[in-house]
Structures are given as C-alpha cells and as structure tokens.
C-alpha cells in the first residue's frame, strides 16, 4: 500500500511543472576606459548606449543555461568614456512545461531573474573605473520576448511569400 502511494506521488510530481534556480554566476566581465585619465578632467555630459542580449542552451537532462549580456558604451561628447560588458548566467532546472511555456520561461522569466545581478555587476564595474554609477532602469523582458516572437513570425511570413 505504501509503495503504491509513493509511486503515485512520484508520478504526480513528475507531471507537475518544476522550476528551480541552481546557480547564478558571472560568465564574462570586461571594462575599457580608452580615454582615461584625460576623460576625468572634462565636463561630464554622458550619453549612454545599452545593448541587451539573451541566449540559452540545454545542458544535460532538464538543466538549462541562460546567459544575459549587457553591453554599455558611454560617450562624453564624441569620445568614448568607457565600454563595459557583463555576461550574467544562470543554470535552471525546468521540467514539465509545454514548448511555448518553456520558450517563454527561457526567453523572459529567466533573464528577468538574472537582470538585477547583471545590473549590479555592471554598476560595480563602472564605479570601480571611477565613473558615476549607471542606475539602469528595469527591463520588461516579457515585452522584449513578445517583440521577438512577432519579429520571427513576420520573418517567417515574409519567407513564405
């Protein structure tokens, strides 16, 4: 009787969706200040360019790595003050999801978890370079994911014609 109850509970657990963050880590980190120290003596009127990218790969079994890349180029006038980049990664255990839910989880939910860590790593890197803190705004990864799906759908329709 107990074996049946245990096997029934195990079967129910294997059918329920599961999500677990296994590890968060910095995969790559870089900082360049090509015009230092001269840039520090200039009036500070920065313009900030931010590039954001995500990628994911399946590891063994139900484990997935998601990498969020934030690249920032800050110019003071026409000169590049600094370039900073962080690749913040995470390993996630994800199972029991249909294909659409898995795609959304990897493309929006996981990057949303990684973003605060990437933002903090980037901010720390910039301030250690003796520049003012960046204070990056939150990112709506659900909206970015929806835009990417729409772009892919339109590209597929264009290729079909």
From Swiss-Prot:
SUPFAM superfamilies: SecB-like. Pfam families: SecB. GO terms for cellular component: cytoplasm. It is found in: Cytoplasm. Its main location: cytoplasm. GO terms for molecular function: unfolded protein binding. InterPro entries: SecB (IPR003708), SecB-like_sf (IPR035958). Keywords: Chaperone, Cytoplasm, Protein transport, Translocation, Transport. One of its GO terms (biological process) is protein folding. It comes from the Bacteria. Homotetramer, a dimer of dimers. One homotetramer interacts with 1 SecA dimer. HAMAP family: SecB. One of the proteins required for the normal export of preproteins out of the cell cytoplasm. It is a molecular chaperone that binds to a subset of precursor proteins, maintaining them in a translocation-competent state. It also specifically binds to its receptor SecA. Belongs to the SecB family. This is Protein-export protein SecB. The gene is secB.
